[in-house]
């Protein structure tokens, strides 16, 4: 049978316990004293340098686009500045070139670099299907491409799959939204059309790009940037 033995606290143990409690009480007093000392130290007055506005970056031209077409596009960017929120990049559709040529130019206005893609024009702009745009039209039902500055707007899914709405900013294309002139992918804008037929197919006025190119086109264009379409 185990006998429980109770031991009375020794004098040495009591002294150790009292010392520990006294030390714990000293810590808050030391912290308070340190805080009071810090509060009494005068801090130097802070004089922040005035914030300068970010310098305006002059857009750099692309060597791929004709100088006159580039000048027109930059002028349109300035003219519609309040509507176009993003001005680091823009897209130029050079409809003087054949549809067999990469003529949809994505231009970085900071670096001056560019990436070019194939893009179809409207059947009403090229009735004979020559591969060259003959005329523009803003008329509903014309199935023609229209010229001028467009604002890249929101995305939606329609009969051509994922598409991006465009808002026409000029009198020559201000029916673009009601005509459903959009950016979308299409089989007739794939590169194999050029190998087979020597030119792309035609849209109903939309900027139709290759199906495999669509994701990159959306990524580079984004929302709030400008497309400028012209023939010079």
Regions found by a protein language model. Give the residues of each.
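Signal peptide processing junction and immediate N-terminal pro/mature segment
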Residues: 30-42
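Cell wall/extracellular polymer interaction/catalysis modules
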Residues: 40-203, 212-215, 219
């Amino acid at each position: 049978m185990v006998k429980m033995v109770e031991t009375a606290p020794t004098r040495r143990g009591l002294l150790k316990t009292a010392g520990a409690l006294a030390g714990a009480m000293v810590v808050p007093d030391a912290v308070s004293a340190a805080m009071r000392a810090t509060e009494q130290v005068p801090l130097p007055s802070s004089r922040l340098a005035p914030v300068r506005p970010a310098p305006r970056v002059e857009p750099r031209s692309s060597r791929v686009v004709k100088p006159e077409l580039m000048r027109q596009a930059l002028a349109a960017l300035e003219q519609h500045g309040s509507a176009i929120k993003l001005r680091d990049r823009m897209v130029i559709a050079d409809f003087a070139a054949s549809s067999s040529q990469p003529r949809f130019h994505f231009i970085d206005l900071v670096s001056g670099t560019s990436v070019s893609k194939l893009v179809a024009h409207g059947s009403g702009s090229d009735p004979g299907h020559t591969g060259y745009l003959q005329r523009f039209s803003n008329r509903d039902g014309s199935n023609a491409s229209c010229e001028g500055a467009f604002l890249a707007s929101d995305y939606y899914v329609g009969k051509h799959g994922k598409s991006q709405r465009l808002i026409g900013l000029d009198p020559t294309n201000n029916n673009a939204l009601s005509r459903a002139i959009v950016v979308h992918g299409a089989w007739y804008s794939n590169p194999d059309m050029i190998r087979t037929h020597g030119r792309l197919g035609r849209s109903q006025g939309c900027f139709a790009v290759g199906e495999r190119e669509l994701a990159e086109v959306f990524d580079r264009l984004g929302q709030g940037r400008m497309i400028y379409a012209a023939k010079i």
